[in-house]
């Protein structure tokens, strides 16, 4: 718990509220403790990675942060606004790209983004402007009037990223944004995210199963397992613990794989596997 407490803070060194401050967060679903008292914070303009296996608690943490569910206890704030007490305000500060596909395949790309702009109560003329703006930023301007059902997988994901950006968020939350994409499509998504970061200075919270993505993109990482943060630091710091040739994959196997093996060696393998499957379905 001391290690996690070291991750938490309420304000940046300049005194401004942090993009994300999470303190002693707990979330459960029935008997499954999905998130078990984690604390962390994210600095302005930072790309922060929340990594871990299925059922680690990453998506449940993100769902609290994005106001989709309420925590059992603890506190999460976004730029100083509590996600429970100021949920509507928080929603206007963040852009969220979930794991599940959110685009309507029977609408055009433009219509999808326009609808998201409407959800934020933007005036009609501004909706049109914002929709065209983010579609162009995602390289979809030429296909904006085509049905999404004709898009490739990479194009669909870029469209959903455009939806997440239409409100010009200060915090972008990406939950497995490139899962299922081929390497070229993944690279295209990240190139456009990086360009936007450079232009706007937005903060990014990322979950991913691709360790090479996390190593390249994230400035800091928290590695979760069974609802707790097992290790945290910069990619370089995490790898240095295991030696000069270590990769982030090695860190993942060391910090997560060992923990799983230890629990199964103690005879709880069946319960551990069942818990992981249940937590994975619940997020």
Region locations from a protein language model:
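Conserved ABC ATPase "signature" region
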Residues: 114, 118, 125-143
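Conserved catalytic motifs of ABC-family nucleotide-binding domains
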Residues: 168
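Catalytic Walker B motif of ABC-type/P-loop ATPase nucleotide-binding domains
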Residues: 172-175
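Helical segment within the ABC ATPase nucleotide-binding domain
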Residues: 187-200
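ABC ATPase "signature
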Residues: 232-233
């Amino acid at each position: 718990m001391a290690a996690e407490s070291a991750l938490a803070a309420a304000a940046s060194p300049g005194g401004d509220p942090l993009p994300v401050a999470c303190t002693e967060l707990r979330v459960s679903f029935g008997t499954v403790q999905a998130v078990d008292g984690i604390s962390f914070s994210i600095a302005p303009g930072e790309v922060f990675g929340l990594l871990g296996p299925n059922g680690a608690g990453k998506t449940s943490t993100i769902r609290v942060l994005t106001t989709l569910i309420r925590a059992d206890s603890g506190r999460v704030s976004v730029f100083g606004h509590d996600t429970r007490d100021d949920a509507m305000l928080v929603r206007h500060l963040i852009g969220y790209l979930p794991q599940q596909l959110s685009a309507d395949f029977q609408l055009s790309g433009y219509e999808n983004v326009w609808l998201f702009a409407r959800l934020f109560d933007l005036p009609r003329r501004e909706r049109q402007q914002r929709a065209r703006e983010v579609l162009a930023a995602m390289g979809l301007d030429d296909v904006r009037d085509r049905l999404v059902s004709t898009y490739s997988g990479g194009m669909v994901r870029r469209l959903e990223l455009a939806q997440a950006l239409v409100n010009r968020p200060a915090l972008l939350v990406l939950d497995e944004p490139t899962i299922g994409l081929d390497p070229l499509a993944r690279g295209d998504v990240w190139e456009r995210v990086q360009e936007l970061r450079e232009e706007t200075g937005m903060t990014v919270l990322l979950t991913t199963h691709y360790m090479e993505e996390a190593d390249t993109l994230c400035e800091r990482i928290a590695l979760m397992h069974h609802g707790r943060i097992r290790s945290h630091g910069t990619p370089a710091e995490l790898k240095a613990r295991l030696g000069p040739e270590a990769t982030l994959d090695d860190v993942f196997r060391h910090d997560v794989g060992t923990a799983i093996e230890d629990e199964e060696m103690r005879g709880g393998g069946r319960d551990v596997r069942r818990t992981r499957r249940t937590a994975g379905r619940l997020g």
